[in-house]
Design a protein with these regions (language model features):
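Feature activates predominantly on carbohydrate-active enzymes
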Residues: 1-146, 157-169
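Conserved Class I S-adenosyl-L-methionine
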Residues: 152-154
């Protein structure tokens, strides 16, 4: 089974009984007010295991979400991004890049999602150029500083469900 099985079941009920679409927030869906929502006697929610163990997305250009505050909260649009991912059967997310990745890791984890990292942030570490803007980003020259950033990234996420990204593309 899945640790998120109950969550997926709740979202299935919200779709099939309440009629709430998976992307309700993104298309300004307003539910119809009803006195009751009858549940058919033969109603069942069954699931089959996903064929792919880890399913998720990278929220690219996430800085565009910052301007979309809802309820006067920068976090609310992120909650809706992560809810949409869960509604679609996802279980893993790269919660942004640079400062945003650290800012929204806990929210994603609290919602039951695995965390992984942008290719420029191995082990979820702060980008070398951000931490040391005046130094050459060279492991040969500053290996100790890279290792310290990686260790800090691991320490910050040790209690989260993480799929560790070890590489850097290119």
């Amino acid at each position: 089974g899945s640790d998120l099985g109950f969550v997926y079941g709740v979202y299935e009920i919200s779709r099939s009984i309440l009629g709430i679409p998976d992307f309700w927030f993104w298309n300004d869906y307003m539910p119809e007010k009803k006195e009751s929502y009858p549940i058919p006697e033969d109603y069942r929610v069954e699931s089959v295991p996903f064929k792919i163990a880890l399913r998720g997305w990278f929220v690219n250009d996430e800085v565009l979400l910052k301007a979309w505050e809802d309820d006067y909260s920068e976090e609310k649009p992120w909650e809706m991004v992560l809810e949409a991912l869960l509604r679609c059967g996802g279980n893993m997310v790269i919660p942004g890049t640079d400062k945003n990745s650290r800012k929204y890791r806990k929210l994603a984890s609290d919602m039951g999602l695995y965390i992984t990292h942008h290719h420029a942030e191995p082990l979820g570490a702060e980008m070398f150029a951000r931490a040391y803007p005046k130094l050459e980003a060279s492991y040969d020259v500053h290996g100790d500083k890279f290792r310290a950033l990686w260790e800090e990234g691991i320490e910050q996420q040790k209690d989260l469900n993480v799929v560790w990204n070890l590489g850097f593309r290119g």
